[in-house]
Amino acid sequence: MKNSFRFSFTVITTFIICVLVSGAMVNGQCSFPQPVGPNGKCVPKDCKSLCHKKYKGGSICTTGKPNICMCLVCRRRSPEV
């Protein structure tokens, strides 16, 4: 009886860990920083072009220091109508 409980507990724990890890892998990293121009400023037009060329995704220029071009590559679910 004690061994069957231990086995069941081990199987359930392993299953839960596998589900959590696979969920993290599916989501993955959604944004990738890209270098900005030599003046250190992110130009939205250049950022958009670079991100579309490299990742086929969207882009955003962050404000503040450092000024970074972020490429957004996660697929978003479309709202259900």
Curated annotation (Swiss-Prot):
InterPro entries registered for this protein in UniProt: DEFL
Keyword Signal: yes
Cysteine pairs bridged by disulfides in the record: 30-74, 42-61, 47-69, 51-71
Disulfide bond as UniProt keyword: yes
BP terms from Gene Ontology: defense response to fungus; killing of cells of another organism
GO cellular component, one term: extracellular region
Major location (coarse): secreted
Signal sequence interval, chain numbering: 1-24
Family note: Belongs to the DEFL family.
Protein name as it appears in the record: Defensin-like protein 144
Gene: LCR10
